Amino acid sequence: LILSLHSPRRRSLILIAAVLAGLFCSANLQSQQDDDVVRVNTDLVILNVTVTDKAGQYVPGLRLADFTILEDGKQIPPELISGFSMHDSPYASVVLLDTSGSMDSRLSLGRSAAIRFLDRLRDEDVAAVYTFGSKVEQLQDFSSSRDLAPTAYGLSAKGMTTLNDAVVDAAKALAARPEKRKAIIVLSDGLDTFSKTSTDKAIETALAIGATIYGVDMSPNDGPRNLRSTAVLKGFAERTGGRFVATPGGQALRDAFTNIADELGHQYTIAYRPANQTRDGKWRKLEVKISRSELEVRTRKAYRAPKG
């Protein structure tokens, strides 16, 4: 049977083929997007908790009995808490350095800050360094080395900004690490302009593996503040229990990285099994309280329950 190109039946077959092709491409795209999310099916919830006094100094010597954990407003009973460790636990971190075109005048400063952070690593800690412009690239893999890779000194600022994709890639890399304390340190001066991933999905991916995000605003001190960019970096930090550092420069930026490294070395880590064992994939609100009212506590605000 030979069909004319212009026959109704031939046109119908072409239309059906086009629809099927579209569905196939859509399924592939959805699969790729699903692959961007780290799936964690463990029932163990890990909280990395920072405790400071009114002067901002880290508070050592607290016991598990000093902490109260609330999930969706309900206290976690002591028998469900399976782990508690203090400052000596190792951490794994990823430094994300923005190398997009707008970072041209700030790239050397960002590199200097990364060097300062690596210099504060303890022997048991590891860090990796990634850059992100129009694409995300690994500059150096996880190690306890305090030296920045020589290729970092040949970096140039160019291209768009893939901040969200960089956070997702960092979370995926950290998911394979055995350390319970995980952190992502972001140095950026602008909004995401080129990622496949949304900001919410990037935060969700970081929360899924228990990573704390520290957002360092690299906008020039003498330039206009980008309020949307600031809000994004603040959101990364606040929702994951990290800190936002506003537009530092020179020594202030290097000090900020020193302080972040010190904070990671002065956290408490608490692991527990939820009383609510429903595997519904829903968000559970988290709150940690401390027995001493003069102290301040910071940790992530939620986690997503496993599904299925």
Regions from the language model: what does each represent?
Residues L3, A27-Q30:
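Intrinsic low-complexity/disordered segments
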Residues I14-S26:
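Bacterial N-terminal signal peptides
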